[in-house]
UniProtKB/Swiss-Prot annotation:
Tissues of expression: Expressed by the liver and secreted in plasma.
Protein name: Beta-2-glycoprotein 1
Lineage: Eukaryota, Metazoa, Chordata, Craniata, Vertebrata
Organism from which the protein derives: Pan troglodytes
Protein keywords: Disulfide bond, Glycoprotein, Heparin-binding, Repeat, Secreted, Signal, Sushi
Positions annotated as glycosylated: T33, T149, N162, N183, N193, N253
One term of GO molecular function: lipoprotein lipase activator activity
Coiled-coil region(s): none
Gene Ontology cellular-component terms listed: cell surface; chylomicron; high-density lipoprotein particle; very-low-density lipoprotein particle
Chain residue ranges for the region called Sushi-like: 263-345
Domain Sushi: 21-81, 82-139, 140-202, 203-262
Matching Gene3D superfamilies: Complement Module, domain 1 (2.10.70.10)
Gene that encodes it: APOH
Intrachain disulfide bonds: C23-C66, C51-C79, C84-C124, C110-C137, C142-C188, C174-C200, C205-C248, C234-C260, C264-C315, C300-C325, C307-C345
Signal peptide segment: 1-19
Membrane spanning stretches: none
């Protein structure tokens, strides 16, 4: 017969053994929660793993029951981030990103000539969608340009309906008698506006003066304006120093003011000189005189080295100075050699 004490002791040990088979707090899984979450569980109690918002379960079981052994089964459940739709290409722009997974943020930029129509960044949400919506790169446009007073639009071709695209240009012209101050060409900028407009102003010039020993012709009208022209000429024996035609400039003055300079009489009876790179007889080439500004080179002798060299002489308003080294060759001194026939130094 079994002792009652032994039976009581055995029951106690059995109770202690069963009570000691509780399950511990379950392992933490990244990006997941456990319900209910306690420090220990009695055999038969159930727990459920759930992925946090923005994550989805991959493989493994979600529900577990605490076994009599007190050991939770190995959990192979994984919670992985939701993946938003591919957004790595932005037409006429660029996307900066690492991944398209929750909760990453991507940013956007547009090429020159385009602007972001939408936000410059978007975040992958818990639902696996981009927020805010993905932007687009739209072309920068400028409205039709304003036309300055006293100007006309000379060149303008809209390329976006009525508007112009970035770097498109427009060219202006001023009305007659008006001068342009500023650039005649404006450009559509990255800000969607045009560069600075030019200004057209009426410009008058005084009547040009007649030069001494010459004459001037200009339009027969009460006032001379921008771009009007005047022509000059000189009387016989004089030549024009400056342009034959001048123009009224945007500053209200003339582009030049020529004068009439006297011609020069040939200073010697006979000599071979260099004119514009060629040897010529001065008495033949300039039988009617040398014009103001004409330049010739006279031949001179170096007696010590027995060679020749040249020195220049120029007609300046009726005066020309012959180089002192030049010796005019007399036709009677036929035994002497002219300097132009001596070998150069």
């Amino acid at each position: 017969m079994i002792s009652p004490v032994l039976i009581l002791f055995s029951s106690f040990l059995c109770h202690v053994a069963i009570a000691g088979r509780t399950c511990p707090k379950p392992d933490d899984l990244p990006f997941s929660t456990v319900v209910p979450l306690k420090t220990f569980y009695e055999p038969g109690e159930e727990i459920t793993y759930s992925c946090k918002p923005g994550y989805v379960s991959r493989g493994g079981m979600r529900k577990f029951i605490c076994p009599l052994t007190g050991l939770w089964p190995i959990n192979t459940l994984k919670c992985t981030p939701r993946v938003c739709p591919f957004a790595g290409i932005l037409e006429n722009g660029a996307v900066r990103y690492t991944t398209f997974e929750y909760p990453n943020t991507i940013s956007f930029s547009c090429n020159t000539g385009f602007y972001l129509n939408g936000a410059d960044s978007a975040k992958c949400t818990e639902e696996g969608k981009w927020s805010p919506e993905l932007p687009v790169c739209a072309p920068i446009t400028c409205p039709p340009p304003s036309i300055p007073t006293f100007a006309t639009l000379h060149v303008y071709k809209p390329s976006a309906g009525n508007n112009s695209l970035y770097r498109d240009t427009a060219v202006f012209e001023c009305l007659p008698q008006h001068a342009m101050f500023g650039n005649d060409t404006i450009t559509c900028t990255t800000h969607g506006n045009w560069t600075k407009l030019p200004e057209c102003r009426e410009v008058k010039c005084p009547f040009p003066s007649r030069p001494d020993n010459g004459f001037v012709n200009y339009p027969a009208k009460p006032t001379l304006y921008y771009k009007d022209k005047a022509t000059f000429g000189c009387h016989d024996g004089y030549s024009l120093d400056g342009p034959e035609e001048i123009e009224c400039t945007k500053l209200g003055n003339w582009s030049a003011m020529p004068s009439c300079k006297a011609s020069c009489k040939v200073p010697v009876k006979k000599a071979t000189v260099v004119y514009q790179g060629e040897r010529v007889k001065i008495q033949e080439k300039f039988k009617n005189g040398m014009l103001h500004g004409d330049k010739v080179s006279f031949f001179c002798k170096n007696k010590e080295k027995k060679c020749s060299y040249t020195e220049d002489a120029q007609c300046i308003d009726g005066t020309i100075e012959v180089p002192k080294c030049f010796k005019e060759h007399s036709s009677l001194a036929f035994w002497k050699t002219d300097a132009s026939d001596v070998k150069p130094c």
